[in-house]
Amino acid sequence: MLQSLAGSSCVRLVERHRSAWCFGFLVLGYLLYLVFGAVVFSSVELPYEDLLRQELRKLKRRFVEEHECLSEQQLEQFLGRVLEANNYGVSVRSNASGNWNWDFASALFFASTVLSTTGYGHTVPLSDGGKAFCIIYSVIGIPFTLLFLTAVVQRVTVHVTRRPVLYFHVRWGFSKQVVAIVHAVLLGLITVSCFFFIPAAVFSVLEDDWNFLESFYFCFISLSTIGLGDYVPGEGYNQKFRELYKIGITCYLLLGLIAMLVVLETFCELHELKKFRKMFYVKKDKDEDQVHIIEHDQLSFSSITEQAAGMKEDQKQNEPFVATPSSACADGPANH
C-alpha cells in the first residue's frame, strides 16, 4: 500500500514538474553536445597542428642557417610585424598588394558581414575613428537588420509556405499536417540546391585555390552566420571584375540568409515541432485560473458595493422624517 502511494506521488510530482525536468535534460544534453564537439575537434585537429608547428620550426631554423647575417631576433620582429599586418587584412606578398580592402565594393561587403553578424575577420578597421564608427554603426544597424529580416521573412513565408499549404489542404483535401511536412522538406531541398550546391560549384570555378568541398564549406559557414574567415572569396591575385564580384557575393549572402530564415520558419510552424518545443517551455496560466481570479475580483467588488449600499440605508433610517412639499400636497385633499 505504501509503495503504491509512494509510486503514485512520484508520478504526480514528475507530471507536475514535467516542463522543468525536460528543460533540465535539455541543458544537460546541450552541455554534453558541447563536450562531444570539443573532443572530436581536438582529436581531429590537434595532430595537424602539431605537424604544422614542427614544419614551421624546421623552416625557420633552415632560414636562419642559410642567412647568417640575419639574427633570430630580427627575424622574429619581422615576422611579428607581418602577422600583425595580416590580421588587419594587409598582406606582404607581392602578388596580393594590388587588392585594396577598403574600396567601395570591399567596404560594402564588410558592412554586410557586420550587420548580418557573420564577421569573417579578414578585414577590420585600422583607425580609431573607424573602430568607433563600427561600434555605433553596429549598435544601430544590427537591430535594424533584424527588423528588416523579420519583415521580409514574414512576407515571404505567407506566399511561399502558408498559402501553398492552405491551397493543397482546401483544394485537394489533403491533410494539413502531411502537406506542411512535405512542403517543408521540398522547400529545404530546393534551398540547399540553390544556395549551397550551385554556388559551391560556381565558387570552385571562380576561386583558383578552392575545391568543391571548400566552396560548400564557405557557403555553409557564411549562411549560418558563423563566419570563421578562413575562406573569403574575391581575395585572390588579379581577380577579374573584383568589385562586381564582391557586390554579387554581398547580394548572394543577403538572399541566402533570407532563404535560410524562411526555411527555419517553415519548419518551426510544423505541428510536431511546436509540440516538441512546448515540452521545454514554462507553462502559461490556465484559463480556468484566470476565470477564478476574475470571479474573485468581481466578488470582492460586489461585496464592497453591497457594504456601501447597506451603510447608506442605515444612514437614511437614522435620519428624522421630514415631510416634503409634494407629500403634503398629496395628503391635503384626502384629509379634507
Swiss-Prot record:
The chain crosses the membrane at residues 21-41, 133-156, 182-202, 244-267. Residues 42-103, 123-132, 203-211, 232-243 are extracellular. Belongs to the two pore domain potassium channel (TC 1.A.1.8) family. Residues 225-230 are annotated as: Selectivity filter 2. Residues 117-122 are annotated as: Selectivity filter 1. Homodimer; disulfide-linked. Heterodimer with KCNK2; disulfide-linked. In astrocytes, forms mostly heterodimeric potassium channels with KCNK2, with only a minor proportion of functional channels containing homodimeric KCNK1. Interacts with KCNK3 and KCNK9, forming functional heterodimeric channels. Interacts with GNG4. Identified in a complex with PSD and ARF6; interacts only with PSD that is bound to ARF6. Interacts with UBE2I. It holds the Pfam family Ion_trans_2. It comes from Oryctolagus cuniculus. This is Potassium channel subfamily K member 1. Expressed in renal distal tubules, especially in cortical collecting duct and cortical thick ascending limb, with lower levels in the connecting tubule. It is found in: Cell membrane; Recycling endosome; Synaptic cell membrane; Cytoplasmic vesicle. The modification Phosphoserine is found at residue 326. The keyword S-adenosyl-L-methionine does not apply. The record marks 146, 261 as: Part of a hydrophobic barrier that is stochastically dewetted and limits ion permeability. Ion channel that contributes to passive transmembrane potassium transport and to the regulation of the resting membrane potential in brain astrocytes, but also in kidney and in other tissues. Forms dimeric channels through which potassium ions pass in accordance with their electrochemical gradient. The channel is selective for K(+) ions at physiological potassium concentrations and at neutral pH, but becomes permeable to Na(+) at subphysiological K(+) levels and upon acidification of the extracellular medium. The gene is KCNK1. There is a cross-link at residue 274 (Glycyl lysine isopeptide (Lys-Gly) (interchain with G-Cter in SUMO)). The record marks 118 as: Important for increased permeability to Na(+) when K(+) levels are subphysiological. One of its GO terms (biological process) is glutamate secretion. It catalyses: K(+)(in) = K(+)(out); NH4(+)(in) = NH4(+)(out); Na(+)(in) = Na(+)(out); Rb(+)(in) = Rb(+)(out). Glycans are attached at residue 95.
